[in-house]
């Protein structure tokens, strides 16, 4: 009997939500690759900025950067 209930559950149609209907057009290009480099240089630029940000945070945390007028005491 448990198998019968499980089989019936697999045949049920999925419910559509308002959010799903709204987001479906965003997923219509799934699996397609745009020709050329696309936005790769922009992504690389922001990755470099993020890496610089992380280095600055790390240097402040390690107290290897001395900031004028700001004393950090843990």
Curated annotation (Swiss-Prot):
Belongs to the PsbH family. The keyword Thylakoid applies. Its main location: plastid. The chain crosses the membrane at residues 41-61. Phosphorylation is a light-dependent reaction catalyzed by a membrane-bound kinase; phosphorylation occurs on Thr residue(s) in the N-terminus of the protein. Keywords: Chloroplast, Membrane, Phosphoprotein, Photosynthesis, Photosystem II, Plastid, Thylakoid, Transmembrane, Transmembrane helix. The modification Phosphothreonine is found at residue 3. One of its GO terms (biological process) is protein stabilization. PSII is composed of 1 copy each of membrane proteins PsbA, PsbB, PsbC, PsbD, PsbE, PsbF, PsbH, PsbI, PsbJ, PsbK, PsbL, PsbM, PsbT, PsbX, PsbY, PsbZ, Psb30/Ycf12, at least 3 peripheral proteins of the oxygen-evolving complex and a large number of cofactors. It forms dimeric complexes. It comes from the Eukaryota. The keyword Transmembrane helix applies. It comes from Psilotum nudum. It is found in: Plastid, Chloroplast thylakoid membrane. Pfam families: PsbH. One of its GO terms (molecular function) is phosphate ion binding. One of the components of the core complex of photosystem II (PSII), required for its stability and/or assembly. PSII is a light-driven water:plastoquinone oxidoreductase that uses light energy to abstract electrons from H(2)O, generating O(2) and a proton gradient subsequently used for ATP formation. It consists of a core antenna complex that captures photons, and an electron transfer chain that converts photonic excitation into a charge separation. Gene3D superfamilies: Photosystem II reaction center protein H. InterPro entries: PSII_PsbH, PSII_PsbH_sf. The lineage of its organism: Eukaryota, Viridiplantae, Streptophyta, Embryophyta, Tracheophyta. This is Photosystem II reaction center protein H.
């Amino acid at each position: 009997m448990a198998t019968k209930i499980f089989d019936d559950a697999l045949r049920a149609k999925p419910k559509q939500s308002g959010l799903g209907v709204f987001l479906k057009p965003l997923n219509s290009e799934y699996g397609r690759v745009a020709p050329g480099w696309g936005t790769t240089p922009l992504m690389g630029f922001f990755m470099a900025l993020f890496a610089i940000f992380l280095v600055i945070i790390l240097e402040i945390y390690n107290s290897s950067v001395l900031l004028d007028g700001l004393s950090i005491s843990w």
